[in-house]
Amino acid sequence: MAAIGHVGVIGAGLAGLAAALAAASAGLRVDVFEAESAPWQPQAHIDVVPNLLRDLVRLGVGEACVRRGFPYRGLAVLDGDGRAQFEIPTPRLAGTQFPSSLGMVYGDLIDLLREAAMKHGARLHTGREVRDACESDNNSDAIVTTDGERHHVDLAVIASGARLPALAGQAARAMPLDILPQQWCHALLPRPVTLERATLVIGTGSIKAMVIPVDTRRAGIAVLQPVGAAATPAAMRATLSSQGRLLQSLGARWSDDTPAVVRPVRSGLLDGPWHAHGVLRIGHSAHELPPHFGQAAAQAIEDAVVLGTLLRTRPSRDDLLDAFMARRAERARQVHAVVTQAARWDLRPEAATDLPALAAQLAALVTEPA
């Protein structure tokens, strides 16, 4: 079987653009197919945790991310009035010239990855929904768009989240999902002058809020709510007004024109190989993690970095698929188990609930690159 020279990526989100950048940087021809005509620009933050920043550095966009974001060190855990409870360290994994972690606007990271991928020669086809991906007769793959065009590539990579194309004319294998009755409401607010690092605020009842500075003017906030709860600005102000002083002050910054992004809490991992009919699934098409410890994004980018590393060896498609699973499957399973436990403790705290111990368990898994 011939070496891979042309990669087709389905989806232009974090995983897809990172995969396109990784493959193009490895010297391969890359085409990206995105169903939407305009880039997704969510008004939300992304927590660039240590292992995520390390992989962004490996992709060549680390310096640009630091310039665009807000570096911080350590996650502070406070009560609703702002009193310190404990701290979770953020080790410096990206090298001494980089901070340990940083906050960014989600859309800014999307922009940086897209620009870098295109600079390295990747071609982006927007408004081109893919209806089918399959193995061709000549040991290559075919990507078929809804307009009927058939695009031949050596490797097709699905990175379109839950929006999966068919595989060889059949529905793609479903990923088992545990849907928790919770949601996170995200927004960008004016940054409190005293906010200089990621902060988890534990209020009364089930209310929690993650607050992360994204630049000198703004901070991202994510408020944990019961699923289906109202997420209008008025509803969020009312929710936070019943909490301690710190959460009250954040709620007061939530103006009527503040857009929000609501994300349900889901946990899933694709059973068995992440490939079928010669087509590879990565990112949220293969695993969906709760947002805890920043691993939902980190694991998606890690998929792309591993893919790029393997492509540099010019493997055949089948050899790459086997090597990719050997590098990613067990590691992703272990990380998925840790962050899912954190989400379940949010839902139903136990006597054994120990967030610092869980963070330490995660750190042991991701300290070394995949």
Language model features with spans:
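Conserved hydrophobic helix-helix packing surfaces used for dimerization/oligomerization
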Residues: V7-V9, V30
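Conserved FAD/dinucleotide-binding core of flavoprotein oxidoreductases
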Residues: F86-T90, A94-S100, V105-D108, R114, ...
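Glycine-rich FAD pyrophosphate-binding loop
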Residues: A24-A44
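Conserved N-terminal helical subregion
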Residues: A2-V7, V49-Q170, D178-L188, V227-P233
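Conserved mid-domain beta->alpha element of the FAD-binding
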Residues: V9-S25, A159, P259-Q341, W345
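Conserved Rossmann-like nucleotide-cofactor binding loop
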Residues: A15, A38, R163
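C-terminal auxiliary extensions adjacent to catalytic cores
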Residues: A360-A370
